[in-house]
Amino acid sequence: MSALRSFVCRIAAACMVCLVCAPFAAQAQVTVVPPSALTPSGSYYTDLIGGGIGNVVVMTGGGNAANVGDPSGRNDDGFSGPIGFGYVLRFFGVDYTQFFANNNGNISFGDGISEFIPTGPTGASAPVISPWFADVDTRGAGSGVLHLRNDIANETILTWDAVGYFQAHDDRLDSFQLVVRGPGYAVPVGEGTIGFFYKGMPWEQTDTSVTGAVGFGDGAGNAVVLAGSNTPGLNEVVANRFVWFDQNLEPVPPVSPIPEPRTYALMLAGLAFLAALSRRRLRPSLSR
């Protein structure tokens, strides 16, 4: 199985290069998001709002059929769905009411994605939202699994919590979270309708895959991708950071923190001291 997968990997990697170089891809509209759009954090969104990360996602299909239906959620290359949003999500001009949760770090529309080669949002076979499209494998005893939380109206949260990588490795575990909001959600200033949140991200690829990819794709080559996707070192770029995107898939700048009253008092005291010192220096000497 490993030898076959290695062969498939080589073929898929070659195809990925062809996709990048093909005229079709050249005609597609691809927007690159700079790493500076990410904000240091180190927390999940659910750490901030409380309530946990939700229930384990049980796979309903995917490449490794032996893991389909396992109540533990442990699997390799599986997906679950379709799952209803409970609202309408407009994505690349199309309205969606349901999605597929894919073990390999993304959600998709219309069909599940079991591909383990992260061709990125530009090469995905279906419309995709990808906080970390990579070769996730949660079969290792030390690995966490994919969770879904949908108890908040107009909000869907998926968490790949401390997940391992192929082939059932659990010596390094990535932790990342996706937040999707419907039109009925009152979005606070400084937040958006889609959020990517990352904790520790110590692994980025496997022996039979390539570095992960981050962003959005419409399944036809048009995409919004984070700079460095499919390039070694991307895991360090996203680790312990987060980013919100608005309805146009543009990054939302974070709101600058408002100084606390005590901070204001210290600032005013400092300004008063500087003003007094300035007046003292400008005061003419009476001894002359």
Descriptions of predicted regions:
Residues A275-R288:
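C-terminal membrane-anchoring or membrane-association module
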Residues V8, A13, A22-V30, L249-L268:
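Short, threonine-centered small-residue motifs that mark membrane-proximal processing/anchoring sites
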Residues Q29-S256:
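Extracytoplasmic Ser/Thr/Pro-rich, glycosylation-prone low-complexity segments
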Residues S2-I11, R283-P284:
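Bacterial Sec-dependent N-terminal signal peptides
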Residues V17-A25, A272-A275:
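Hydrophobic h-region of N-terminal signal peptides that target proteins for export
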